[in-house]
């Protein structure tokens, strides 16, 4: 059993251990494959492996794209290592020595000339690795460069390197061709170097990876450019290493060749490589706090067979953070150096005995522009108990969320549009989706209508055309649908249902009448018995038998007891009983004729006759009469038609449109007309009336006031880009020499701070192999790496809330943009914004984590001058300044233990400001934006959520000259052009109207979308002389509605029918387009309007499909036949 136990345990543990060695490499692909030799790159840092195992490592790929064969060749490296001398017991400059040997490494990133270009044309990948090593182990970094076509060909594949397996995952971003930075799509533009157009072009920090390519030639003498560009004393540049760096910017670009004088990107990378040659560190997670000991400076022979030392290095022990692969500079031939546990000299102020990095990673600042943000289209269909939705955007979706749906972060793509699928679990309320900064509302009522239509059509699939025509009427939500069902059922089956339902009602009524009659007879008998008993007790005495003690109801019964009980007989059945009270009482309980005296009395009481109007009348009612059935049938059809028409128009909540009849309301101007109300920032407001002369009603003037939605405009100061970064605390210790003697790798980081503890005088702060007190140095270094831009910040200087107000008063047409505490004033009308309730204030900072169209956060406290690490705005890159580093206010402490290496401790904050904000993001105020316009100095947008409110006051004076202003010469002609959408109360329809204006240059008015009875929507529009195209959106109507374009009481002669609501996808409505308050005072639909609407519906339902009428008449005939069978006409015989 023991061996089986271990085998089972091994089978359980082995898959877990195998999975632990699988790591992900993400390759970010653009949305579309652009022209040009673009390549994409990805890399991943892997855990350490023993130094001895590096000689056998080689990348092995299972990807269907072949790896470039030249990487499989063996590259000879000079391995430089250090070791302590056996005769030295204490650390000093002479206590160690370097050893140079030749090793063969296969698969390192030694790229050949034209390799990347050839791999693009031959559709091959370039897979290689870098090594960061100390004296015992190495941390590999795996790189993969593939042509951009791989984004369309592959989804994932697997690469093996040593003991590790790397899953390569291709992820598409929503960027068309650009690089995803700060949630925005940045396109580097090398043609823009010095002139940055405000609001169009910007400067962004972009990640870059460079590989050295060794090639000989006069044009590849890289150190000639080093000598020109930097203050270098490099001599004999003719005999220095020759070649160039090939770089990929942002993970997705065409190759950039470094140095290239006419390419700004190339020179930025060239500057970064030689000013910060170590580049980004290769620390893994958890290695932010580490230490290493400096052993001392050393020289080595490269190659190992050289007669003299050719390379300077610094030996160390501890966690390796930087690449151990480099290229010797003192030879035109590329001499590859592998230096585990040593920092090669990469400073080229003096080019003697130096090297250059084989692979360099870092960040460079590039000019470019951001891709435009495209609006979203959201569709939904009913799926099970919920809805299945899709979101599309031509230019990609940068952000999509929903408070009531399950939106996956894994994006899928279809052709040139990005498609994101998600599921909404409930459809009992409208679905709200935020997509690309827009608030979309999907009206789920239409989805339910579609499912209802689909179900009814499926049940009556033998006649699908008829079933669909009837289903679209039955499935209208609310009382209207039930009224329609009742109307159709009454028409088709009323001749059977009316007598059947009447019979049921009569049966119930007769049953109730019978119950009441029986109850009354019993109560009358009980009353008689009670009176007899009371009278007997008053005159004769008790009615209780002396023998059996039974209480009698009548004197005759008492007399019978007096005769039979003494003789031991039952007075009712004359059965013999024991002459005891208990025996008699027990017998009476089982005796069957104890009620015979009561029955005799009941016969003597005269029964009460039925009244003619109750039970007898119910029995004689002729519910089978054809006259009664026909009368009820007609009455129900008329009543249900009125109820149907009354329920056909829905009254939604404001600020959405309210259905009303034709026309415009009128106001007699006895006094000044004043309106005072609060209006949300996302709402438009339209007020339209006829102002009439109170002395003569025939004189009137048209008043039309249009107030557009609020525009928020802020003058800002662009603070720049906010960065996230990782703070590293490193301890560098060496036994001898001053702290300035060695150059530490963090010196080339953009943000670093160092505290030195030099020449210690305590034995407790020196390891056992140090020479003693008063020597050496402990350097404590703080530096930031893995910098990543996360957002753009803008400080509000001034803020302005404004609305555009237009007034049409008779012939007068005036418009003005008014601010808070400002007024529009004309001769007769005054419109003022008295105040605004807002969450913005001067001095706030607006932070955008992505495109400005997606909204942002409001910061009341944002550091701009003295920033500490961890504050909002701690790491900034302003456009007009250099990189701004934060302060590190914490203090250092050197922790000492006897005979051990000192360790640096830092008591300050180690968490970046960005990570702190994300951890508490719910505590910050957010805002959404739409209709965004921005430059570096000003941002304007509209609030789609209506979170702000304006207090508005409108005053119209009563002093109007009706005699001179009453005549309006403007003439309007109407024509209905086309219609889109569906009738009903779902998403609605859009009516296209051709409106002609003559006799005046401009005219502000409203065009309505109406049928014969009711108007369902309106659009306020400023007409110009000539032909105008106006689109009017509305909701409502029925299958018979013929929608026309109307102006007041005048409508176009020809109307159009809208489609029926069905199971098609429901398109989301932009909230900013749907939020408006329209008030023209038109009357509500009355009784006459109801009859007009019913007639239009009845004519409409039959005009388009005559077979529906035929089918309904067939059902009517069937019900008549069924009535004649079940209820035949009663024949009367002649006497």
From Swiss-Prot:
Glycan attachment points: 134, 235, 347, 399, 928
Residue ranges constituting the ITAM domain according to the UniProt record: 611-634
GO molecular function, one term: zinc ion binding
Alphabetic keyword roster: Activation of host autophagy by virus, Disulfide bond, Fusion of virus membrane with host endosomal membrane, Fusion of virus membrane with host membrane, Glycoprotein, Host endoplasmic reticulum, Host Golgi apparatus, Host membrane, Host mitochondrion, Host-virus interaction, Inhibition of host innate immune response by virus, Inhibition of host MAVS by virus, Inhibition of host RLR pathway by virus, Inhibition of host TRAFs by virus, Membrane, Metal-binding, Repeat, Signal, Transmembrane, Transmembrane helix, Viral attachment to host cell, Viral envelope protein, Viral immunoevasion, Viral penetration into host cytoplasm, Virion, Virus endocytosis by host, Virus entry into host cell, Zinc, Zinc-finger
Transmembrane segments: 486-506, 628-648, 1106-1126
Region (Binding to the ribonucleoprotein) location: 516-533, 588-605, 592-603, 611-625, 1122-1135
Residue ranges of coiled coil: none
Lumenal domain ranges by topology: 19-485, 649-1105
Signal peptide coordinates: 1-18
Any one Pfam family match given in the protein's UniProt record, by short name: Hanta_Gn-B
Gene Ontology process terms (BP): endocytosis involved in viral entry into host cell; fusion of virus membrane with host endosome membrane; signal transduction; symbiont-mediated activation of host autophagy; symbiont-mediated suppression of host autophagy; symbiont-mediated suppression of host cytoplasmic pattern recognition receptor signaling pathway via inhibition of MAVS activity; symbiont-mediated suppression of host TRAF-mediated signal transduction; virion attachment to host cell
Zinc finger CCHC-type: from-to: 545-565, 570-591
Disulfide bonds: 29-151, 63-157, 109-128, 133-138, 175-185, 210-247, 234-351, 376-435, 380-389, 405-424, 452-475, 735-770, 739-777, 751-885, 765-896, 780-904, 806-815, 823-832, 863-867, 970-1000, 993-1045, 1010-1015, 1046-1051, 1085-1089
Motif YxxL per record, residues: 615-618
Fusion loop as annotated region, ranges: 757-777
Stretches assigned to the Cytoplasmic side: 507-627, 1127-1135
UniProt GO cellular component terms: host cell endoplasmic reticulum membrane; host cell Golgi membrane; host cell mitochondrion; host cell surface; membrane; viral envelope; virion membrane
Site (Cleavage): 648-649
Protein family according to the UniProt entry: Belongs to the hantavirus envelope glycoprotein family.
Protein name: Envelopment polyprotein
Organism: Hantaan virus (strain 76-118) (Korean hemorrhagic fever virus)
């Amino acid at each position: 059993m023991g061996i089986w136990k271990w085998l089972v345990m091994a089978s359980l543990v082995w898959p877990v251990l195998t999975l632990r060695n699988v790591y992900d490499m993400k390759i970010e692909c653009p949305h579309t494959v652009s022209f040009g030799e673009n390549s994409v790159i990805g890399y991943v840092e892997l855990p350490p492996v023993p130094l001895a195992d590096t000689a056998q490592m080689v990348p092995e790929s299972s990807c269907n794209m072949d790896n470039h064969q030249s990487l499989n060749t063996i590259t000879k490296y000079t391995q430089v290592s250090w070791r302590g001398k056996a005769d030295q017991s204490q650390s000093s400059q002479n206590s160690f020595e370097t050893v140079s040997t030749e090793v063969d490494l296969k698969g390192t990133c030694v790229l050949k000339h034209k390799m990347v270009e050839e791999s693009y044309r031959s559709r091959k990948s370039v897979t290689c690795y870098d090594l960061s090593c100390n004296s015992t182990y190495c941390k590999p970094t795996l790189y993969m460069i593939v042509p951009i076509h791989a984004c369309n060909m592959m989804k994932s594949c697997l690469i093996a390197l040593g003991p590790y397996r790397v899953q390569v995952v291709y992820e598409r971003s929503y960027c068309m061709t650009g690089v995803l930075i700060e949630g925005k799509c940045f396109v580097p533009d090398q043609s823009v170097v010095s002139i940055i157009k405000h609001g169009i072009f910007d400067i962004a920090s972009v990640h870059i990876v460079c590989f050295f390519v060794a090639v000989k030639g006069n044009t590849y003498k890289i150190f000639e450019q080093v000598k020109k560009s930097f203050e270098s004393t490099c001599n004999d540049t003719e005999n220095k290493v020759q070649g160039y760096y090939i770089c990929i910017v942002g993970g997705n670009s065409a190759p950039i060749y470094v140095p290239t004088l006419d390419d700004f990107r190339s020179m930025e990378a060239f500057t970064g490589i030689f000013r910060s040659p170590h580049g980004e560190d290769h620390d893994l997670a958890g290695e932010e706090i580490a230490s290493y000991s400096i052993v001392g400076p050393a020289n080595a022979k490269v190659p190992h067979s050289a007669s003299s030392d050719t390379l300077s290095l610094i030996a160390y022990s501890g966690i390796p953070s930087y690449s151990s692969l480099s290229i010797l500079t003192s030879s035109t031939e590329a001499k590859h150096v592998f230096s585990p546990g040593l920092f090669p000299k990469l400073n080229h102020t003096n080019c003697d005995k130096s090297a250059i990095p084989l692979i360099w990673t870092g960040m460079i600042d590039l000019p470019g522009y951001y891709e435009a943000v495209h609006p979203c289209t959201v569709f939904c269909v009913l799926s099970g108990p919920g809805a299945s939705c899709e979101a599309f955007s031509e230019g990609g979706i940068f952000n999509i969320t929903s408070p009531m749906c399950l939106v996956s972060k894994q994006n899928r793509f279809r052709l040139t549009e990005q498609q994101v699928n998600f599921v909404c679990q409930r459809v009992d309320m409208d679905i709200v989706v935020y997509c690309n900064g827009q608030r979309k509302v999907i009206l789920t009522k239409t989805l339910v209508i579609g499912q209802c239509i689909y179900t009814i059509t499926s049940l009556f699939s033998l006649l699908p055309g008829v079933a669909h025509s009837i289903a679209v009427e039955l499935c209208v939500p609310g009382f209207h649908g039930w009224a329609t069902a009742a109307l159709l059922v009454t028409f088709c089956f009323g001749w059977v249902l009316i007598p059947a339902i009447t019979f049921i009602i009569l049966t119930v009524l007769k049953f109730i009448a019978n119950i009441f009659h029986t109850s009354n007879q019993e109560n009358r008998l009980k009353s008689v018995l009670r009176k007899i008993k009371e009278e007997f007790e008053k005159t004769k005495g008790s009615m209780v038998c002396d023998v059996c003690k039974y209480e009698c109801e009548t004197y005759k019964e008492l007399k019978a007891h007096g005769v039979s009980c003494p003789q031991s007989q039952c007075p009712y059945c004359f059965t013999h009983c024991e002459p005891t009270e208990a025996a008699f009482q027990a017998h009476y309980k089982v005796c069957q004729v104890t009620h015979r005296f009561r029955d005799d009395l009941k016969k003597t009481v005269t029964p009460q006759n039925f009244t003619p109007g109750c039970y007898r009348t119910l029995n004689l009612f002729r519910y089978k009469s054809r006259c009664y059935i026909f009368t009820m049938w007609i009455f129900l059809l008329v009543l249900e038609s009125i109820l149907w028409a009354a329920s056909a128009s829905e009254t939604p909540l404001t600020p959405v449109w309210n259905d009303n009849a034709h026309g415009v309301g009128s106001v007699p101007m006895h006094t000044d007309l004043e309106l005072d109300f609060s209006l949300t920032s996302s709402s438009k407001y339209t007020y339209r009336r006829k102002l009439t002369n109170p002395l003569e009603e025939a004189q009137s003037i048209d008043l039309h006031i249009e107030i557009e939605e609020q525009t928020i405009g802020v003058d800002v100061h662009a603070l720049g880009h906010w960065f996230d970064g990782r703070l590293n605390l490193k301890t560098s210790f060496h036994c001898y020499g001053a702290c300035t003697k060695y150059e530490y790798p963090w010196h080339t980081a953009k943000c670093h701070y160092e505290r030195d503890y030099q020449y210690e005088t305590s034995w407790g702060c020196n390891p056992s192999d140090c020479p003693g007190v008063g020597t050496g140095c402990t350097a404590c270094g703080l530096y930031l790496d893995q910098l990543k831009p996360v957002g753009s910040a803008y400080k509000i200087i001034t803020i302005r809330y404004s609305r555009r107000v237009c007034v049409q008063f008779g012939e007068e047409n005036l418009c003005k943009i008014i601010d808070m505490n400002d007024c529009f004033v004309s001769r007769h009308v005054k419109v003022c914004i008295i105040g605004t309730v807002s969450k913005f204030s001067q001095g706030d900072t607006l932070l955008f984590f992505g495109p400005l169209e997606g909204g942002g956060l409001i910061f009341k406290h944002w550091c701009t001058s003295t920033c500490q690490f961890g504050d909002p705005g701690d790491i900034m890159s302003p456009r007009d300044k250099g990189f701004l580093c934060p302060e590190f206010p914490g203090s250092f402490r050197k922790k000492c233990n006897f005979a051990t290496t000192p360790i640096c401790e830092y008591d300050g904050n180690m968490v970046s400001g960005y990570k702190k904000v994300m951890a508490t993001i719910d505590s910050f105020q957010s805002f959404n934006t739409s209709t965004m316009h921005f430059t570096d100095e000003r941002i304007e947008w509209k609030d789609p959520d209506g979170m702000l409110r304006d207090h508005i006051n409108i005053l119209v004076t009563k002093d109007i000259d009706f005699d001179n202003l009453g005549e309006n010469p403007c003439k309007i002609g109407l024509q209905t052009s086309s219609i889109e959408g569906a009738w009903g109360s779902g998403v609605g329809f859009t009516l296209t109207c051709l409106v002609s204006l003559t006799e005046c240059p401009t005219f502000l008015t409203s065009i309505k979308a109406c049928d014969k009875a009711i108007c369902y929507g309106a659009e306020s529009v400023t007409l110009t002389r000539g032909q105008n195209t106006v689109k009017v959106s509305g909701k409502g109507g029925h299958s018979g509605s013929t929608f026309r374009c109307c102006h007041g009481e005048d409508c176009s002669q020809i109307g159009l029918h809208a489609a029926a609501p069905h199971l098609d996808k429901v398109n989301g409505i932009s909230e900013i387009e749907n939020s408006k308050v329209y008030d023209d005072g038109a009357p509500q639909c009355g009784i006459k309007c109801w009859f007009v609407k019913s007639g239009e519906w009845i004519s409409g339902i039959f005009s388009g499909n005559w077979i529906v009428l035929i089918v309904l008449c067939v059902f009517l005939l069937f019900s008549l036949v069924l009535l004649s069978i079940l209820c035949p006409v009663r024949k009367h015989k002649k006497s």
